[in-house]
UniProtKB/Swiss-Prot annotation:
Organism: Helicobacter acinonychis (strain Sheeba)
Annotated site residue numbers, Transition state stabilizer: R17
GO molecular function terms listed in the Swiss-Prot or TrEMBL record: 3-dehydroquinate dehydratase activity
S-S bonds: none
Name of the encoding gene: aroQ
Name of the protein in question: 3-dehydroquinate dehydratase
Enzyme superclass (EC): lyase
Length: 168
């Protein structure tokens, strides 16, 4: 299973950016932690990482995932969470599970950070757990995709389901 991890603006500055809020872990270290989790858990998962500070590039990357072999997306849109209806629209058209991650609890921050347009478009939001939130999102995504696959297989193998009856 292939999962796309999209990182938004200023996340490339983790380790330098306000350590009391974001800690000292860098973005590369977060990605290494995720890869280690995949290996230690013996998951059949391939992760692709993408970081940009540009809204349009996030939208392009989500759109490129449509019809691709990416089965799910984990996204931290950073501050675009609070401003980008365009990214929210792209998430809604992705046609696959999307989970939003935030290192901090955006509900405990400034008032303008409490609304997440992009989070409302996602299947779920994980926030406030620091770098661990990415592995939490990864665990959730693997489970969601496994459930979807099992459901699809059950539908295909059940001769009494309505789709098979329509085709007969």
């Amino acid at each position: 299973m292939k999962i796309l991890v999209i990182q938004g603006p200023n996340l490339n500055m983790l380790g330098h950016r306000d350590p009391r809020l974001y800690g000292m872990v860098t973005l590369d270290q977060i990605h290494e932690i995720m890869q280690t989790f995949v290996k230690q858990s013996n998951l059949d998962v391939e992760l692709e990482f993408f970081q940009t500070n540009f809204e349009g590039e996030i939208i392009d990357k989500i759109q490129e995932s449509v019809g691709s072999d990416y089965e799910g997306i984990i996204i931290n849109p950073g501050a675009f969470s609070h401003t980008s209806i365009a990214i929210a629209d792209a998430i809604m058209l992705a046609g696959k599970p999307v989970i939003e991650v935030h290192l901090t609890n955006i509900q405990a921050r400034e008032e303008f950070r409490k609304n997440s347009y992009t989070g409302a478009a996602c299947g779920g939001v994980i926030m406030g757990f620091g770098p661990l939130g990415y592995n939490m999102a990864l665990m959730a995504m693997v489970n969601i995709l496994a459930e979807m696959k099992a459901f699809q297989e059950a539908q295909q193998n059940n001769p009494n389901n309505s789709i098979n009856n329509i085709n007969n």
